[in-house]
A protein has these predicted regions:
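Extracellular beta-rich repeat passengers
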Residues: 206, 222, 229, 234, ...
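Extracellular beta-strand/beta-solenoid scaffold signature
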Residues: 83, 112-125, 180-182, 209-217, ...
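Residues at the C-termini of beta-strands that transition into short coil/loop
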Residues: 99-100, 107, 268, 283, ...
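Bacterial N-terminal signal peptides
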Residues: 9-20
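Bacterial N-terminal signal peptides that target proteins for export
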Residues: 1-11
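Extracellular polysaccharide-degrading/modifying enzymes targeting complex plant/algal/animal polysaccharides
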Residues: 26-234, 241, 411-427
C-alpha cells in the first residue's frame, strides 16, 4: 500500500498501545462445538512462516494442522487470507498471526489496460473478470492514497454515476453496456472511466483499484481458529467476511480500514468473538446478520459511511467496551423481519454523534439490553423492546427516576481512542 491518509495512518501507529489495552473476553457459551479457554490452549504445533515455509498465505493455511501457528511479517501483502472448512481441535487451534501485517485489497491499475479516449479521460472495458450490481455498489478507487467513492456507499446513499461530459479531474464513473448486460443475468458489462487533468500522465495520478473481495474470509465449516494482529484494507467488500457455520473462532486485535462494505460481518450461523477491533472509514463498522452469534469487546469505530452498528435477523449479539465516533447515515440499527427476533446486549458503550443528528433505532421484533450506555448528540427510537441500566441517552437518565452515569467515558477514551481522534472527544 502506498499510503493511507491522515488520520488513518495514525491508527497503524496506535497498534502498540492498543495491544496493551485488550482484555480477555469470556466465551459465548454456545451449544455444539466446545470452546477452549485461554489456559486450555496447547502451543505445541509447528511454526509456519509465510515466505519461508510456505510461498503464499493460502498455501500456509492449507498446510496448517491443529496446534500450528502461521506467521506473517509486519509488512503489506497484496493478498487475502481465506479459511474454507479449516479446523483446529479443542485446545489446539490453528493460529493465524499477522504480527502487524496489512492485507491490502487494492492493486495499482494496469496502465496498459486503460486507453485515453480524449485528453485526460481514460477508459477500461474489462477491469474485473466479473462484475455485478453488488460489486458495483461497493466500488471505489484509491486515488493518490485516498478512497474515492463518488458519493456512493454499499448500504447507504448512492449518488447517480456522473455523465462523461460532467466528469471533473479526480473523478471516475461507470457506463453500463446495455446491449451486453442482460436482465436475465446478474452480470454487468460496461466501462469504467477515470478523469485526470489533460496532459498529465495516468501513472502520475497514483490510482489503485480494489481487486480482492475481502481481507480475511471464512466460508464453510470452520472451527478452533485464532486470527490476530492483522489489518485488512481496501477490499471491495468486507475487511473480515465471515460466512458459514464457524465455531470457537476468535479474532484478536484486528483492524478494518477503508473497506468497500463492512469492517466485519457475520452471516448464516457463524459464531465468533472479537477481542479488540478498530473499524475506520468503511461503509459499516459492524454488520451481523441471519442467525449469527457474535461478541465484541474493546472496539473503536469511526468515519463509517452507511451504518456504524447494524445488527439483523435472528442473531444474538453483544458489544462491550466500545467507542463510536459517528459520522455515518445511521449510528445504530437493530432490525428483524416479522418472523424473526434479533437481540443485542450493549455494555459500557459510548456513541458520540459528530454532526447531523440521527437516532439509534430499535425496530419492531428487536430487543436491546443496555447497561452503562451513553449516547451523545443523538436520541433513541424504540419500536421493539429495550431495557436500560445506568444509561444516558442525550443527557436523559434511563431508566427514568434512577441516577445514571452511563459509560465509563474517561477510561474508554483513554484506552480505545487513537490519538488522531482524541481531540474529538474533548469537545463538548
Amino acid at each position: 500500500m502506498s499510503s493511507i491518509p491522515s488520520p488513518f495512518c495514525t491508527v497503524f501507529l496506535f497498534l502498540a498501545a492498543f495491544l496493551q489495552t485488550v482484555e480477555a473476553v469470556p466465551d459465548l457459551g454456545n451449544a455444539g462445538t466446545q470452546v477452549a479457554k485461554p489456559n486450555e490452549i496447547v502451543r505445541s504445533g509447528r511454526n509456519i512462516h509465510v515466505g519461508v515455509d510456505a510461498k503464499t498465505i493460502q498455501e500456509a493455511i492449507k498446510m496448517a494442522q491443529p496446534g500450528d501457528t502461521i506467521h506473517l511479517e509486519p509488512i503489506v501483502y497484496r493478498d487475502y487470507a481465506g479459511f474454507y472448512g479449516k479446523k483446529g481441535e479443542l485446545g489446539k487451534p490453528v493460529i493465524f498471526d499477522g504480527h502487524g501485517a496489512t492485507l491490502e485489497g487494492s492493486d495499482p491499475i494496469d496502465l496498459e489496460k486503460w486507453r485515453e479516449v480524449e485528453p485526460g479521460l481514460f477508459a477500461n472495458d474489462a477491469l474485473l473478470p466479473r462484475l455485478d450490481e453488488a460489486i458495483l455498489s461497493r466500488w471505489f478507487f484509491v486515488w493518490n492514497g485516498e478512497m474515492n467513492h463518488m458519493g456512493r456507499t454499499s448500504k447507504g446513499k448512492k449518488a447517480p454515476f456522473k455523465k462523461l461530459q460532467d466528469l471533473q479531474p479526480g473523478e471516475w464513473t461507470f457506463v453500463v453496456d446495455t446491449e451486453r448486460s442482460q436482465a436475465s443475468s446478474k452480470q454487468l458489462f460496461g466501462t469504467f472511466y477515470l478523469k485526470i487533468p489533460p496532459g498529465e500522465k495516468l501513472a502520475a495520478a497514483n490510482i489503485s483499484a480494489p481487486m480482492r473481495s475481502a481481507g480475511v474470509q471464512l466460508s464453510g465449516d470452520n472451527a478452533h481458529l485464532i486470527i490476530r494482529n492483522i489489518t485488512a484494507t481496501h477490499p471491495y467488500n468486507d475487511g473480515f467476511n465471515i460466512h458459514g457455520d464457524c465455531r470457537d473462532v476468535v479474532f484478536e486485535n484486528i483492524r478494518a480500514i477503508e473497506c468497500g462494505d463492512d469492517g466485519i460481518s457475520a452471516h448464516e450461523s457463524a459464531e465468533y468473538r472479537v477481542e479488540g477491533l478498530v473499524s475506520i472509514g468503511n461503509s459499516t463498522g459492524i454488520t451481523d446478520t441471519v442467525a449469527a452469534q457474535t461478541s465484541y469487546k474493546n472496539v473503536f469505530i469511526a468515519d463509517c459511511h452507511a451504518y456504524d452498528l447494524f445488527f439483523l435477523n435472528n442473531g444474538r449479539y453483544k458489544l462491550e467496551n466500545a467507542v463510536v465516533w459517528s459520522t455515518s447515515q445511521h449510528p445504530l440499527t437493530i432490525d428483524a423481519a416479522a418472523n424473526e427476533r434479533v437481540e443485542l446486549d450493549l455494555e459500557n458503550v459510548l456513541i458520540r454523534r459528530a454532526d447531523k443528528t440521527e437516532p439509534a433505532l430499535v425496530q419492531k421484533n428487536a430487543t436491546l439490553r443496555a447497561a452503562r450506555l451513553t449516547l451523545e448528540n443523538m436520541e433513541m427510537t424504540v419500536r421493539g423492546v429495550a431495557s436500560f441500566e445506568n444509561c444516558l441517552v442525550n443527557g436523559k437518565m434511563l431508566p427514568e427516576g434512577v441516577v445514571a452515569t452511563g459509560a465509563d467515558k474517561a477510561s474508554l477514551i483513554r484506552q480505545l481512542v487513537p490519538s488522531a481522534y482524541q481531540a474529538k472527544f474533548r469537545q463538548p
